[in-house]
Amino acid sequence: GYIKRVRNGVFSFNDLKGRQGIILCETAQKLKNYMDELGFYYYISGLDILAKYMLHIPEQYPVIAFIEKAAKEEIYNNLLAEGFEVIEPQYTKKMYEDAMLSGSHNMQVILYTTEDFQYSSEGLASIEKAFADLYFAITRNGYPLSLQELVRIYQNLSRLGNIDKKKLITVASRRNIQYDIRFIVENRFITDSAIEFGKILRREE
C-alpha cells in the first residue's frame, strides 16, 4: 500500500511510490485522508514534508496546508465540523500559544489559500516548496519552530543533495521571500566584509 505506520501517530509514504519516505504526523494524515474524500485541490507542506531531515521531531505542531482559493469557505467549514482547529496564518503564534496554555492543541491546521499547485504532487508539497513555506511561516507568522532547527534541516537537505537550490529560489519568489532565500543559498559565497557592509548600510538607512 501507499502508507505504512512508523510508530504511534506517525505514518510514512513508501519509497517505491517516489515520495522518498515522507513522514506525516497523525493530524496531517487525517487531513490528507479527509481532503482526498472531499475532492478539492490541496497539498500539505512545511514540517510534515521535512520532518525526516530533523534529529528530533516535535511531538505536536500545527500542520501547514494549502487549499484552493475558490473553495476556502466550504473546506474551512468541513474541517471545523470534522474536529480540526483551523488557523488563519496571521494568527499562528497566538493560536498556538493559546492552545499550549489550554492543552487543546490537537489537530491544528494552518490554512493558506492558493491557485497554484505546480510544486505539489498527490497532496504533498515538493521539498523546495515545503522549505520555502516553513521559512515563511517561521519568519513572517511566528510558527513554533526555531530558526536553528530550520538551519539544521537545510544543512541536512544540502548534505544529502535533496534540495534543488535554483528551484528553491524560484519557489521563494512566489512567496516574495526570494531575497531571503537567495541570501541563504548563496551564503557560503558571501564574504564577512559584504555581510558587515550590509549591516552598516541598514544602520545608515
Model-derived segments and spans:
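Hydrophobic alpha-helical interaction segments
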Residues: 87-205
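Short, charged/polar, Gly/Pro-enriched secondary-structure boundary elements
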Residues: 17-24
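Hydrophobic beta-strand residues in large extracellular and virion-surface proteins
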Residues: 3, 65, 109-111
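Generic structural motif
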Residues: 16, 68-70, 114
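Short gly/ser-rich loop at a beta-strand->alpha-helix junction or flexible surface loop bordering the NTP-binding
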Residues: 9, 24-106
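A short, conserved structural fragment
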Residues: 1-8
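Short, flexible beta-strand-to-coil junctions
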Residues: 7, 69-70, 136-139
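Minor-groove-contacting beta-hairpin "wing" of winged helix-turn-helix DNA-binding domains
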Residues: 9-15
